[in-house]
């Protein structure tokens, strides 16, 4: 509900959740019990479901459990969006736009985090230094260090149509024999 109609139909959402499960180290059940805690924050800052699901793929694939990923991603999004935070102020200074404006313009999370990484590198800081909480810093660092995973997941989210039907057919064929 936090996304309104922008997340797509129930089938579209199901396709993306199954794709997240298939690419990451999580289950649809774990996502179902965790994602609701971060979706309002994501929606508030213009982070669409493809970006959010790709963040889950990347964090869980790289050893962060689903529930922890929720906490880390939520912390990261809050700091990126909260005026006065180092991350938010750096984005505004470098681009002239807020985090939400950057997301609304079509940038991905890794595009935005790449801007922060460049700024951190230029000032001799780490990505973790751009965030006040360890959780937010860990999420950001994981997404930047594994941007290839994130970008691959984003591509798969775009092509996820039919994933639910395929999964259903697999279950049907498995139980039929």
Task: Please report, for each region that a protein language model flagged, where it lies by residue.
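Carboxylate/His-rich catalytic cores and anion/metal-binding grooves
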Residues: 1-6
């Amino acid at each position: 509900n936090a996304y309104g109609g922008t997340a797509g139909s129930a089938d579209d959402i199901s396709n993306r959740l199954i794709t997240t499960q298939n690419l990451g180290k999580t289950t649809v059940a774990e996502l179902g019990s965790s994602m609701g805690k971060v979706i309002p924050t994501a929606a508030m800052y213009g982070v669409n479901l493809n970006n959010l699901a790709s963040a889950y793929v990347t964090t869980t694939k790289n050893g962060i459990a689903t529930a922890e990923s929720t906490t880390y991603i939520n912390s990261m999004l809050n700091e990126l969006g909260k005026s006065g935070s180092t991350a938010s102020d750096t984005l505004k200074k470098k681009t002239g736009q807020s985090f939400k404006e950057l997301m609304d313009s079509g940038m991905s999370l890794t595009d935005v985090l790449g801007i922060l990484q460049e700024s951190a590198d230029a000032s001799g800081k780490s990505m973790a230094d751009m965030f006040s909480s360890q959780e937010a810093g860990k999420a950001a660092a994981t997404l930047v260090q594994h941007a290839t995973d994130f970008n691959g997941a984003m591509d798969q989210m775009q092509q996820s149509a039919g994933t639910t039907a395929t999964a259903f057919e697999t279950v049907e064929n498995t139980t039929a024999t």
